[in-house]
Regions:
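Pre-Walker A (Motif I) flank of P-loop NTPase domains
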Residues: 571, 582-588, 612-613, 687
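Pre-ATPase regulatory/linker segments immediately N-terminal to the P-loop/RecA-like helicase/translocase core
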Residues: 106-109, 289-323, 455-577, 633, ...
Length: 702
């Protein structure tokens, strides 16, 4: 092909496929004002040395594509080197990376991870601990030591430690603690000694920065980033891994999944810094930090265009599978489920013993599905399709190709400032009033400078994205983003809490005192991830449980409880008695204000609290949970004692119930007494547990 013209990128709508040609219509492309919109173009695919790595056979009409690094010939055919399917559907970098394993690459790994629950184990705890070590060393470089860091980690996730069967035995726990100390020593030494040798500016490092790309359809949170503007130097990425490198370890190789994760971070940083792939070698240095190995912990690698094409083609295949769920077709979804098997996932020769173990794990999903009855399969598939559609709306919202208005996460880059203003979906023109991000408070107080911000659709506890404002708010995804939570919101000020404490305020100060910032609401995948796994757990449940959920069997009754409270009406007594007499479940439905919480729940708790049975009380929203907490306290005569354990965070819990959070309960004990036995004792002494469905669902060990 003789090159005639080059175009950096295009956002297009796929109209029709004709063999190796995609007939597309150009759409408005962010930051590119010179693009002719609604122009019909022909895109050539499956071309050797250009884009043959991309399999476009299963692309569907009226889908969005993002084309990058495009060449045009004299006949006006477009030859993109990168083709991204449904770029507004952001996939986590780590989820894509899991498709690349030592035993082969397969998009079905994504579905496997999506559906099969992962039990709490020591490897997860160790990885979590290693990340805390980094946080502690950067935020408290002088005062940090292993004992305090290990204790702090235990206090931050006491339930996880107490319910982890891998370390239940004392000797196993001591071995785990020793492993943690080894990781601590190596991480601290690398940060204090090796980082300077790599040219990493410790004072400029940012922890856990978030980036999203509406071009590549990915989002990711890096562990450590030393960001340099394109003209000023080299950006350094450090991704921490507490697991093992490839076996056998040659001292420089990186596991496929870790390598892919690192390469996708290259994409995110290159977009933020406006780099082309030819500049990566000189402008980005990425490292995997293996904290388990004794030597050669830091391993560097730079991706090639061919590898990036392979990675993004796998991302496209994941999206194709997700689109099958959206069609709500039982036969198509069932056919896809049958593709999740060891033959499609294990593609390389591995040791027979390991192959057998791995195949058993992989095939467990399909085998469970096959053993299920027809009605159970249909229930599973129907809800899988339904949840997938809701998840899609959460990410992209309801939009069409003509105006592309979105109400999901994609609204951040698809909707303009005026549209966000009309829906009160943005707080903008904020300036920093007080910065405490480098203190234990981990907060910033912003002052509102625009009168249009008097009204907004935000409240305390909302999870948001914070980003530095440019002149027209159009380049949001070209910035580093901070995930935060609104701690308080007032007429003139808004205070936000950050998950990660930073070493200093240098990043924020680099923009100047008058720099303006914006807040928009974030959308989380975690609740949906729990729903997918719960669906598979339904197939694994006992037969009686499945039959009750499917209403094949009627809920059973115990003997008449004979409840009677002279202070209640006959109808209220009847309802409570039926609930107490139920063996399996009891459904109470009624409009707001009819006393479901203030009377029925309150008196049910009052009756059951002396039975020594554990009671789990759930609601959808934190506000509803707080109302339930009020009702529980009322059933105890508003005693000041700890009457229940509340699951959640400080910011999501009403002030008067924060003392019931487990971390605050154990905070009343001295550090010398802190132990798993203490946690068990606290939990055993309490019989009432309260939280949102999401908070309980995300913590299955509870």
């Amino acid at each position: 092909m003789s090159k005639y013209h080059e175009i950096k990128e295009l956002r297009v709508l796929l109209l029709k496929k004709e063999k190796d040609i995609l007939i597309c219509k150009t759409l408005k492309t962010p930051l590119l004002s010179n693009i002719e919109i609604n122009k019909i173009i022909q895109v050539k695919v499956n071309k050797p040395s250009i884009n043959k790595a991309f399999d476009c056979n299963d692309f569907w009409e009226n889908t969005i594509l993002y084309l990058l690094d495009i060449q045009m010939d004299k006949d006006d055919f477009f030859y993109p080197k990168i083709i991204v399917l449904e770029p507004d559907y952001l996939l986590d970098v780590s989820a894509i990376a899991e498709c690349f394993q030592d035993y082969g690459t397969s998009e079905y790994n994504y579905l496997l991870s999506k559906l099969i629950p992962v039990n709490n184990n020591k490897h997860i705890l160790l990885g979590n601990f290693a990340n805390m070590v980094v946080d502690e060393i950067f935020s408290n470089p002088i005062e940090t030591d292993f004992d305090n860091t290990f204790l702090k980690h235990f206090q931050s996730i006491p339930f996880e430690y107490t319910t982890c069967k891998d370390i239940d035995d004392k000797n196993d726990f001591l071995k785990f603690q020793a492993d943690c100390k080894g990781h601590y020593v190596r991480i601290k030494s690398l940060i204090n000694n090796n980082f300077k040798l790599l040219g990493i500016n410790i004072d400029k490092v940012v922890l856990e920065p978030t980036f999203i790309s509406e071009k590549y359809g990915i989002q990711g949170r890096l562990d450590i980033l030393d960001f340099e503007e394109k003209e000023q130097g080299i950006s350094k990425i450090i991704e921490l891994k507490s697991g093992t490198p490839p076996f056998p370890d040659d001292g420089f190789s990186i596991k496929p999944s870790h390598q892919v994760q690192l390469f996708l971070y290259y994409l995110l940083i290159s977009q933020a810094n406006k780099l082309n792939i030819q500049e990566w070698e000189d402008k980005i240095h990425g490292y995997i930090l293996y904290s388990k190995t004794i030597k050669n912990n830091l391993r560097h690698k730079t991706p090639s265009l061919e590898i990036i094409q392979e990675i993004l083609n796998t991302r496209n295949k994941i999206i194709i599978n997700e689109h099958i769920f959206l069609q709500d077709n039982i036969q198509k979804t069932e056919k896809l489920i049958f593709q999740i098997n060891s033959e499609n996932i294990i593609k390389k020769q591995i040791h027979n013993k390991f192959n057998d173990i791995l195949a058993t794990k992989i095939n467990s999903l399909l085998e469970t599905f096959i053993k299920s009855s027809e009605i159970e399969k249909k229930y599973f598939i129907t809800y899988l399709n339904y949840v997938s559609y809701e998840h899609y709306l959460n990410k992209i919202g309801i939009c069409n190709s003509s105006n592309e208005k979105s109400s999901g996460l994609a609204s951040i880059w698809l909707n303009n400032l005026k549209e966000k203003q009309e829906k009160f979906e943005i707080i903008y023109d904020l300036i920093i009033h007080e910065n405490k991000i480098d203190t234990k408070e981990q907060t910033i107080i912003f002052k509102k400078t625009n009168l249009k911000n008097q009204y907004s659709n935000f409240r305390e506890g909302d999870i948001c994205i914070l980003y530095p404002k440019n002149e027209n708010y159009e380049n949001i995804t070209g910035n580093q983003l901070f995930k935060c939570t609104i701690k308080s919101i007032q007429k003139d000020f808004v205070e936000v809490y950050f998950r990660y404490k930073q070493r200093n305020q240098l990043f924020f100060k680099s923009f100047g005192r008058k720099k303006k910032w914006a807040l928009e609401r974030d959308f989380l995948d975690s609740s949906f991830n729990t729903l997918y796994k719960n669906l598979f757990q339904f197939l694994q449940a006992k037969k009686i449980t499945r039959n009750l959920i499917l209403t094949i069997e009627k809920p059973r009754q115990n003997t008449n409880y004979q409840y009677n409270n002279l202070e209640l009406s006959p109808e209220q007594n009847r309802i409570i008695n039926k609930a107490l007499s139920a063996k399996d479940y009891f459904i109470l439905n009624g409009p707001p204000g009819t006393g479901k919480t203030s009377i029925i729940i309150k008196n049910l708790v009052k009756e059951l609290k002396n039975s020594q049975k554990n009671i789990l009380i759930l609601a959808y929203t934190n506000r509803a949970v707080d109302e339930l907490c009020d009702a529980i306290n009322s059933s105890f005569g508003n005693s000041e004692h700890i009457n229940f354990i509340r699951f959640g965070t400080e910011l999501s819990t009403a002030d008067n119930h924060r003392k019931n959070l487990l971390k605050n309960i154990i905070g009343n004990f001295s550090e010398q007494k802190m132990s798993r036995n203490l946690i068990r004792k606290i939990v055993d002494e309490q019989h009432i547990f309260v939280g949102t469905i999401a908070s309980i669902g995300n913590n299955e060990h509870i």
